Design a protein with these regions (language model features):
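Proline-centered loop/turn at the N-terminus of a beta-strand
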Residues: 1-3, 95
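Substrate-recognition "cap/lid" segment bordering the active-site pocket of phosphatases
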Residues: 3, 9-75, 82-89, 107
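Acidic, Mg2+-coordinating phosphoryl-transfer loop and its flanking beta/alpha structural elements
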Residues: 75-120
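Short acidic-hydrophobic, aromatic-tinged amphipathic segments that line or gate anion-handling sites
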Residues: 119-127
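Short amphipathic alpha-helix with an adjacent loop that forms part of the alpha/beta core around
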Residues: 127-135
Length: 135
């Protein structure tokens, strides 16, 4: 099962998913809007101000709580150090997978991702498939 946790607003995330007809592959989607709604709820109930955006693992743990099928593990694929920090802070045991595809300075990004705790760093999706399959 695949899910999305993005720091982008809902309108941006859904635009891309709908444009490329990908939404059907992601039954669970959390966006910046979900973080803001939960922050407002917490403030209203507890008068506490906090940020649930990454690197806070809120979205990842919410995804894990909403998974209805048996899972043997969780992987979080991201291209920023904050993504790996969120994975490592998750109480749900996410493994951080750093993706170098979008980086103009792949060596620098690889160092940053490893430094903040990436469990894996990959250059393509074939490597991701091997990780998930345990090879």
């Amino acid at each position: 099962m695949m899910a999305i946790a993005t720091g982008r607003p809902e309108v941006e995330a859904y635009y891309a998913l709908n444009f490329f007809d990908l939404k059907k592959y992601f039954p669970i989607i959390y966006t910046l809007d979900d973080c803001i709604r939960e922050e407002q709820k917490i403030y209203k109930e507890e008068r506490v101000t906090l940020s649930l955006s990454k690197p806070n693992p809120f979205m990842l743990d919410a995804i894990a709580e909403n998974v209805k099928e048996d899972c043997t593990g969780f992987f979080y694929v991201g291209d920023m150090p904050d993504d790996m920090i969120a994975a490592s802070r998750s109480v749900s045991g996410f493994k951080g997978v750093g993706l170098l595809l979008s980086a103009p300075d792949r060596d620098g990004l690889k160092e940053d991702l490893i430094r903040v705790g990436a469990d894996y760093v990959i250059e393509n999706f074939e490597e991701l498939r091997r990780i998930i399959e345990g090879r």
